[in-house]
Amino acid sequence: MSRNELFDVTVIGGGPAGLYSAFYSGLRGMKAKIIEYQPMLGGKVHVYPEKMIWDVGGLTPISGAKLIEQLVQQGLTFHPEVLLNEKVESIARNEEGLFELHTAASGVHLSKTVIVAVGGGILNPQKLQIEGAERFEVSNLNYTVKSLQHFKDKTVIVSGGGNSAVDWANELEPVAKKVYLAYRKDALSGHEAQVDQLLNSSVSCFFHTEITKLIASEDHEVIERVELTNAQTGEVMELPVDEVVINHGYERDTSLLENSRLDVTRVDDYYIAGTSNCQSSVPGLYAAGDIVHYEGKLHLIAGAFQDAANAVNSAKRFIDPEAHKSAMVSSHNEVFKERNRELVKKMFV
């Protein structure tokens, strides 16, 4: 399809909120497009593919990877156009009242409405500030834990003390040979239950301590030891390790709204201030998922689904004020008639 083709709705972001927005747009007969910055759909769930997710209504415990698979399958039900590896750099409105989405790779995309579903935004991990550290990113310097199996029977040090660092240390503890955690402050700042679990486990913690040097193997290909320095005592020690995991927080890319020629009201200089129907301060522009802020907002995947449906319904009524307030429920929706016939056949084969 041509990028200048007009769409009813363009969804920025291909995570849970974006994928459900695409699905629900199809349910409402809207021509939809998803533009995703990453090379794959699924959003932040990719950060924890092996973790079990318990709080999606109607689903028994499911791994992040499996949830992504199902979200993508559902999101593509009505064949929205999908663009991957595309960053929307700004949003504007032309003289005809149409939205123009400017992307780095393919120029301008036209849409009657827009749903911003970028979650926490484009998050870049804060890198370890040690000269030459980047060369170990292809070997054993990690900024995420994608596979627990990768760390099986290894000695691992986690640097950081926030929610993700504590969570990773807890996840690795029963899998790895030994887990250490180094944190520059005197107390961990993760969730209380997770911190208690960590402090009562076999994980060895070094407080007031930072990684100050990476010591390479003889071939200089992997980290063999780390130098730890205690900021209070000045004590320096070396620790043999197989893997180094860094979680020092993330740098959030806020350029999308900052570069846009639209008066979008924001909260805390990032989140889009919205209504319970996910309407922003700009008519025709909506937000769903973690990016939107309103009273009573639920920051769960389940909440993202409701946001997505509300945003799509609002977009539909923006285009056609006479349209129904919501889509017909799927169990009685004619759009699924033939699909249901095929599914029923398979059930009784």
Swiss-Prot record:
Coiled coil: which residue ranges?
none
**Keywords for the protein's UniProt record, in alphabetical order:** FAD, Flavoprotein, NADP, Oxidoreductase
InterPro entries xref list: FAD/NAD-bd_sf, FAD/NAD-binding_dom, Fd--NADP_Rdtase_type_2, Ferredoxin-NADP_redctase_2
Enzyme Commission number(s) of this protein: 1.18.1.2
Annotated positions binding FAD: 36, 44, 48, 88, 123, 290, 331
Needed cofactors: FAD
Q: Return the cofactor note field.
A: Binds 1 FAD per subunit.
- What protein family is recorded? Belongs to the ferredoxin--NADP reductase type 2 family.
Instruction: State the protein's name.
Output: Ferredoxin--NADP reductase 1
Q: Which organism is it from?
A: Bacillus licheniformis (strain ATCC 14580 / DSM 13 / JCM 2505 / CCUG 7422 / NBRC 12200 / NCIMB 9375 / NCTC 10341 / NRRL NRS-1264 / Gibson 46)
